[in-house]
């Protein structure tokens, strides 16, 4: 399903020479639709309690970022236009890494508490230190915090957006702020929120086995 979503970015990128040469208005609409998609999905992610739903809507929002970057490649500034295309492809790769880490981390968490709901979590940093650390790295990356890869790909996207239109630049900056909000809401709720002692007494949370945590460490090092 995740690959099918990313296919839209790949298709626009493959057709980019045709769009830029013969139908640049298509790229304009791609940018506008991408911005709306990024905003709508980010707002929905802010109110989800199922951790997999948060990550799913986050993926939709980040795909919107990539489409916006492709759409603003029609900027009058040739450098900024080329930057938009490159930033989109760069963000496609960085997003693949930190979102893979987030979903694998979510799998470890669900394995530990047998629930997708944040209400069944809270205080897991004491029981799952490695998952906690790697999940934090992924949250920092997707939020665009320096010096992780997400900072550089989002910075390039925002630079291209401001060159295209100051309004588009500020809109995407605000959406980047929303991304940081819902990801740290998720992180805090899982690892620092109020612990559900009744559920944890019935089934004590535990760190995932090495076969599950080793990929987390590997992906965290790539970010």
Give the role of each language-model region.
Residues 2, 6-222:
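Hydrophobic transmembrane alpha-helices and their helix-loop junctions in integral membrane proteins
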């Amino acid at each position: 399903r995740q690959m099918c979503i990313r296919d839209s970015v790949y298709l626009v990128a493959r057709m980019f020479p045709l769009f830029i040469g013969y139908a640049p208005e298509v790229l304009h609409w791609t940018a506008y639709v991408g911005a709306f998609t990024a905003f709508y999905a980010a707002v929905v992610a802010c109110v989800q309690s199922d951790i997999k739903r948060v990550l799913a809507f986050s993926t939709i929002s980040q795909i919107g970022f990539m489409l916006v970057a492709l759409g603003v490649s029609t900027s009058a500034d040739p450098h900024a236009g080329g930057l938009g295309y490159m930033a989109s492809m760069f963000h496609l790769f960085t997003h693949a890494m930190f979102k893979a880490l987030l979903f694998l981390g979510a799998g470890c968490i669900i394995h530990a508490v047998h629930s997708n709901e944040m209400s069944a979590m809270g205080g897991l940093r004491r029981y799952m230190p490695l998952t906690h650390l790697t999940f934090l790295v992924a949250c920092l990356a997707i939020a665009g915090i320096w010096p992780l890869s997400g900072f550089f790909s989002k910075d390039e996207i925002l630079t291209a957006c401001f060159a295209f239109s100051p309004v588009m630049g500020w809109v995407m900056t605000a959406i980047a702020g929303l991304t940081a909000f819902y990801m740290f809401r998720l992180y805090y709720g899982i690892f620092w929120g109020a612990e559900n002692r009744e559920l944890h007494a019935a089934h004590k949370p535990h760190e995932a086995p090495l076969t599950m945590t080793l990929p987390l460490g590997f992906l965290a090092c790539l970010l």
